A protein has these predicted regions:
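Long, low-complexity, charge-biased intrinsically disordered regions
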Residues: 1-210
Length: 210
């Protein structure tokens, strides 16, 4: 390639699109600590106290938490909720599958957010404050086998009674693809919700294989 095109050697690749690669012995790590610090600073959460979890069992989101009149909607207009969710989503898509469920829930209320939704968004940022040094780690191996897992709850959406499912695929000891999203159809049983989750995960696994 060097003989055909002009190529400039910039040395070993360490940083790209807010992703930092770290080599440790037989492992390669991907980190977004620098990006997370910028997000925390942007939303004035740089010195916030850390949270142990982005969301806890029993947390519920529904349309009743949204503003019911124009006055309350006007009060929420100055809150940078959509920007915060978008920033969290970029971290989630790149290196943080552990916040996929929470960010997915927050994204459902961008058009009419309530104070409770903003509190949870800040809670996710507090969680990132305490875990910003987390990395996706991949080990050198001759066995490049993709392993996938899927799961689903049942009728967790209070408004639509639809279930939320998720899947994750592992390669070389680290996550390479993941998703958490509300199902498009209403499952009538836990078994049906799990079957839908398994189908979606299998379809994505076939795509990864191809």
């Amino acid at each position: 390639m060097i003989r055909v095109y002009f190529v400039k050697d910039m040395g070993e690749h360490l940083m790209s699109l807010a992703l930092r690669s770290i080599k440790i012995s037989r492992y390669l790590g991907l980190s977004q600590e620098t990006y997370i610090n910028k997000v925390l600073e942007r939303f004035r959460m740089k010195n916030c106290s850390p949270s142990v979890s982005p969301i806890v069992k029993g947390d519920r989101f529904n349309l009743d938490q949204c503003p019911k009149n124009d006055l309350k909607r006007e009060q929420m207009k100055n809150i940078p909720y959509a920007s915060a969710v978008g920033s969290l989503m970029y971290a989630q898509v790149c290196t943080r599958p552990d916040i996929a469920f929470a960010v997915g829930m927050l994204g459902r209320y961008q058009s009419n957010l309530g104070k409770d939704h903003w509190k949870v968004a800040k809670k996710v940022m507090r969680y990132l404050q305490g875990t910003k040094d987390y990395k996706l780690m991949y080990r050198r191996t001759n066995n490049l086998e993709v392993v996938g897992y899927s799961d689903s709850d049942f009728a967790s959406c209070v408004d639509s009674r639809k279930s939320t499912f998720g899947y994750i695929f592992i390669l070389a000891g680290g996550a390479i693809s993941w998703r958490s999203i509300k199902q498009t159809m209403t499952a009538t049983s836990t078994m049906e919700a799990e079957f839908i989750s398994c189908f979606e995960a299998t379809s994505h696994g076939v795509w990864l294989y191809i």
